[in-house]
Amino acid sequence: PIEVNDDCMACEACVEICPDVFEMNEEGDKAVVINPDSDLDCVEEAIDSCPAEAIVRS
C-alpha cells in the first residue's frame, strides 16, 4: 500500500499528477491517500515528483 508520511509539505504535486489516488486533507496541510492499493502508473510519477519524498510504500 501507499501512504503519505508527516514529511508532506502540501505542495499538491501528487494530487495534480494522480488525483484518483491522492487528495488534500480537510485542513489542506497534507496529502492523503484515497486509494492505497492503486497500481496506476501515475503513482510512480507522484512518488518521483514529491519534493519532500513523503510518499512511501508500506
Curated annotation (Swiss-Prot):
One of its GO terms (molecular function) is electron transfer activity. Residues 2-27, 30-58 form the 4Fe-4S ferredoxin-type domain. Pfam families: Fer4_13. Its cofactor is [3Fe-4S] cluster; [4Fe-4S] cluster. [3Fe-4S] cluster binds at C8, C14, C50. The keyword Transmembrane does not apply. The keyword Nucleus does not apply. PROSITE patterns: 4FE4S_FER_1 (PS00198), 4FE4S_FER_2 (PS51379). It comes from the Bacteria. Binds 1 [3Fe-4S] cluster in its tetrameric form. Binds 1 [4Fe-4S] cluster in its dimeric form. Keywords: 3Fe-4S, Disulfide bond, Electron transport, Iron, Iron-sulfur, Metal-binding, Methylation, Repeat, Transport. Disulfide bonds join C18-C42. The modification Cysteine methyl disulfide is found at C11. Signal peptide: none annotated. Ferredoxins are iron-sulfur proteins that transfer electrons in a wide variety of metabolic reactions. Homodimer (ferredoxin I) or homotetramer (ferredoxin II). This is Ferredoxin-2.
